[in-house]
Design a protein with these regions (language model features):
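Bulky hydrophobic/aromatic packing residues
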Residues: 1, 6, 81, 109, ...
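Conserved alpha/beta enzyme-core scaffolds, especially Rossmann-like or related mixed alpha/beta domains
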Residues: 1-31, 154, 192-211
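Residue-level detector of secondary-structure boundary/capping sites
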Residues: 4-7, 131, 184
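Generic recognition of stable, solvent-exposed alpha-helical segments in well-folded globular domains
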Residues: 11, 135-138, 188, 206
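Active-site cores that bind ATP or allylic diphosphates and position pyrophosphate for catalysis
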Residues: 30-169, 176-180, 229-233
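Non-catalytic terminal extensions that flank enzyme cores
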Residues: 60-61, 77, 166-168, 172-233
Length: 233
């Protein structure tokens, strides 16, 4: 899919490049982790700006040894937005994230740029996704602003965890949606998940349409939810 949209991503990338905000980075992941830099909430390293000030001569010398990835310079400023589920959220891009990747060394465009360009191109006005992507939002809002694109409204839902508090994973033998659909009707699955999220008092079958009239983000918990024991036997 990304290969089909490469031209669109390149156009946006070149706009950022023309602003003087893009620079080559030669740091490896292992080097960054070894530097004991602070970590972001999603587990990544806060980039310390190691390659931000390289001279043209230094860049040329480093290119002889490896192809660079490319990062976007971020300002030392707070970006605040109101999340539909989590409420007001503030992040300082420089301190909480650092300059972030726009393009990998192999030429593939990074998620942050691709998702912004894709959503704007498709006219997306509301984004509902997992709370594990909350920390990406400030970066994306910064890109929307630089590219002069309309930003959607965001709502980040708490994650549904296994009953013992770990992330659900096929590798650990947890239920996949595919397996559940083989044993339950769609209404059964929706109703039980609605119960787990506190949207109804018992795990009775429901359709998404029947939940809409009483839905409010205020009813959705702000913290991750452990799947009730025995909900899906």
């Amino acid at each position: 899919y990304q290969s089909e949209c490469s031209g669109i991503y390149t156009e946006s990338y070149k706009k950022l490049e023309a602003m003087g905000l893009v620079y080559p980075c030669f740091c490896s992941r292992s080097q960054l982790h070894a530097a004991s830099a602070p970590h972001t909430s999603d587990g990544n390293v806060v980039y310390p700006g190691t390659c931000r000030g390289l001279t043209a001569e230094e860049i040329a010398e480093k290119r002889k040894k490896k192809a660079p990835a490319y990062r976007l310079m971020v300002p030392d400023e707070n970006i605040t937005f109101t999340d539909g589920c989590m409420g007001e959220h503030t992040e300082n891009l420089l301190r909480d994230c650092g300059d972030f990747y726009l393009r990998r060394a192999d030429g593939v465009f990074a998620y942050q740029l691709a998702v912004v360009v894709d959503d704007a191109r498709m006219g997306v006005t509301e984004v509902v996704r997992g709370a594990d992507l909350l920390s990406s939002t400030a970066r994306q809002l910064y890109l929307y602003r630089l590219l002069d694109l309309p930003a959607p409204k965001f709502a980040h839902c708490p994650l549904l965890l296994a009953s013992d508090g770990r992330r659900l994973s096929k590798r650990d033998g947890d239920q996949s949606l595919e397996n559940l659909r083989a044993r339950y009707t769609a209404e059964d699955i929706v109703g039980r998940l609605a119960y787990a999220y506190g949207l109804q008092e018992e795990p009775a079958p429901r359709t998404p349409e029947s939940l809409i009239k009483d839905f409010s983000w205020d009813k959705v918990p702000k913290k991750d939810i452990c799947l009730p024991e025995g909900l899906f036997e």
